[in-house]
């Protein structure tokens, strides 16, 4: 063993590698992305690593490998599990031969997600065991144990770190490479009575699942990561039940105090019933400190009824704990003070509060998406139109002054929502904006639906040749894989033509006049058509010469600021200035300026 300073996601990856991982697949999404990327960096060639087209593809690939006896891991964020739930629900009934861990990173807050959904609920829904780590060291150790449980009980298991565990750092003890487990898959053994899902088999396996989970309920009551921290005062009649990062916050707040007993739940499903009952006995009240849903709270309420225990369970359901958002040491301290009758902690305030302006997220300076949105906005000026957005950097197109995203639901939804709006408002020109990675992940089926059902819509693909928002991962259109292989690019143009979209035009959005003309030419044609705005992500290319303002020509109309919202254009002493450190020389502002006062940029 040796010590390393690791991010939580890196620790999870290193733990999986140490457990004999053979295959890892996934789709990038904060806060899970670094798990797969770290695995790839520490791959000696014995692990197959793949960024899949979407989470469903990743799940099915990993399942196939697990059927062969391989140890596999699938990585995604919590909303990715919605995409992967179809194969997962059936896989729960079929089972696996090799250990299979489905890593789903939850995002309390949410910090970078559409929802605050709780994967612990999905565990109970799918009847799959779930592991909920409370810190970086535990995440490293627990992922190895998760593989062992999965393999022993022939079932996929869910592994559910949250954002603060994923992105937290700690010095932890890790195995030396010589101590890594080496797993040699047996290979696929044909057995249609096991691997082919039919109603009769599902019925039989459902019974086996229930029996297995009853067994695991007992096993997890003795699992070392589920534990009771005894009260400092044996006569204390109050207790705390918690989990995950909230357990770490709780122990930090209680440090040095006369603390009540604490129940730590590391496996929310199957719930460690016997351990929980042992904890509840003799207590008058228990406060449940949880993020997201009241999973532990509801389990304890159920157990009090089942075993006729008089303990009062408090938490989210009793409005003693906030119903939404993430916890913190401060929020936990406040909740504990109210529950235990301690003096409320004074709010820490700096002597001189910093006067910081609000800084909402914006598209980067030089981002081609800004030009794409602006081109469509210019072309549709005065026309009745709806702009359906999607998940990615380009969701920021909803911000002023662009104001070009009217809807955003989930990945790929904009393509289909556009069709629905068009059916109700046939006189409205409907656009669906989608990124190149999202196109491959979840928009193609929607486009097939549009062609088949004769929709009237315009698909706008914002193609910057990368999965930008999550850290520039490759996708099928980039011609590169996560293993570093150079492969044939999957052409968006050819794909659209192949499914029957007859009008597909490609244009560089930074050539503004051409882009506006393209939109006017394409958008008003009947039927399904597509515009591909193709220009590389500004973060990945070398910046050109920054723009310059010729003050003798500048009339201070501020059109460049009012219409574009580029962070590279600022007001200084009442005058428009170019922020040289940010400007990439994209030239968009030069093309917007009515007096040609901006020059020096590469596209101007």
Feature roles, as predicted:
Residues 1-9, 19, 133, 137-363, ...:
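Flexible, low-complexity linker and terminal segments
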Residues 46-47, 105-109, 126-131, 284, ...:
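Short beta-alpha connecting loops at secondary-structure transitions
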Residues 44-52, 94-105, 182-190, 452-465, ...:
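A glycine-rich helix N-cap at a beta->alpha junction
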Residues 107-156, 162, 189-194, 200, ...:
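Conserved thiamine diphosphate
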Residues 1-136, 164, 231-233, 259, 398-532, 542-543, ...:
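Thiamine diphosphate
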Residues 35-38, 61-63, 84-88, 110-117, ...:
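Short acidic, glycine/serine/threonine-rich loops at helix termini
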């Amino acid at each position: 063993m040796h010590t390393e300073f690791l991010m939580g996601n890196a620790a999870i990856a290193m733990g999986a590698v140490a457990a004999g991982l053979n295959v890892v697949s996934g789709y990038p999404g904060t806060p899970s992305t670094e798990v797969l990327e770290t695995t790839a960096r520490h791959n000696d060639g014995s692990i197959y690593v793949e960024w899949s087209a979407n989470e469903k593809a990743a799940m099915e690939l990993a399942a196939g490998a697990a059927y062969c006896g391989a140890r596999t891991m699938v990585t995604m964020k919590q909303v990715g599990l919605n995409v992967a739930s179809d194969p997962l629900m059936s896989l729960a009934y079929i089972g696996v031969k090799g250990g299979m861990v489905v890593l789903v990173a939850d995002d309390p807050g949410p910090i970078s997600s559409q929802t605050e959904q709780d994967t612990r609920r999905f565990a109970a829904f799918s009847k799959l065991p779930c592991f909920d780590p409370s810190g970086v060291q535990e995440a490293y150790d627990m992922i190895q144990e998760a593989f062992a449980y999965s393999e022993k009980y022939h079932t996929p298991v869910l592994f559910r770190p949250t954002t603060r565990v994923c992105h937290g750092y700690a010095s932890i003890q890790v195995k030396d490479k010589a101590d890594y487990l080496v797993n040699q898959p047996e290979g696929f053994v044909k057995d249609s009575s096991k691997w082919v899902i039919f109603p009769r088999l599902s019925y039989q396996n459902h019974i086996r699942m229930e029996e297995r989970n009853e067994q695991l309920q007992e096993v997890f009551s003795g699992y070392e990561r589920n534990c009771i921290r005894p009260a400092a005062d044996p006569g204390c009649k109050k207790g705390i039940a918690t989990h995950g990062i909230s357990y770490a916050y709780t122990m930090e707040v209680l440090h040095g105090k006369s603390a009540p007993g604490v129940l730590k739940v590391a496996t929310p499903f199957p719930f460690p019933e016997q351990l929980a009952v042992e904890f509840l006995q003799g207590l008058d009240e228990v406060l449940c400190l949880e993020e997201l849903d009241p999973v532990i709270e509801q389990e304890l309420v159920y157990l009090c009824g089942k075993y006729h225990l008089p303990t009062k369970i408090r938490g989210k359901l009793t409005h003693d704990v906030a119903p939404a958002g993430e916890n913190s040491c401060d929020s936990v301290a406040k909740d504990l003070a109210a529950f235990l009758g301690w003096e409320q902690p004074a709010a820490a305030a700096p002597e001189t509060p910093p006067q910081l302006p609000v800084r909402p997220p914006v598209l980067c300076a030089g981002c081609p998406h800004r030009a794409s949105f602006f081109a469509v906005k210019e072309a549709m000026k005065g026309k009745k139109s709806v702009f359906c957005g999607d998940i990615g950097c380009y969701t920021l197109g909803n911000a002023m002054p662009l104001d070009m995203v009217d809807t955003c639901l989930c990945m790929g939804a904009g393509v289909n929502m556009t069709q629905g709006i068009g059916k109700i408002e046939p006189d409205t020109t409907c656009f669906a904006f989608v990124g190149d990675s999202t196109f491959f992940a979840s928009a193609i089926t929607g486009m097939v639906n549009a062609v088949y059902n004769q929709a009237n819509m315009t698909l706008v693909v914002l193609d910057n040749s990368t999965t930008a928002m999550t850290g520039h991962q490759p996708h099928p259109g980039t011609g590169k894989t996560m293993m570093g292989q150079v492969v044939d690019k999957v052409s968006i143009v050819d794909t659209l033509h192949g499914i029957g979209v007859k009008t597909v035009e490609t244009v560089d959005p930074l050539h503004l006049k051409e882009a506006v003309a393209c939109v006017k030419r394409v958008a008003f044609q009947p039927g399904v058509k597509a515009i591909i705005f193709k220009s590389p992500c500004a973060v990945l290319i070398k910046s050109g010469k920054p723009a310059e303002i010729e003050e003798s020509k500048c009339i201070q109309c501020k059109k460049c600021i009012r219409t574009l919202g580029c962070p590279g254009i600022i007001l200084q002493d009442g005058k428009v200035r170019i922020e040289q450190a940010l400007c990439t020389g994209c030239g968009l502002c030069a093309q917007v300026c009515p007096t040609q006062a901006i020059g020096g940029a590469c596209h101007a």
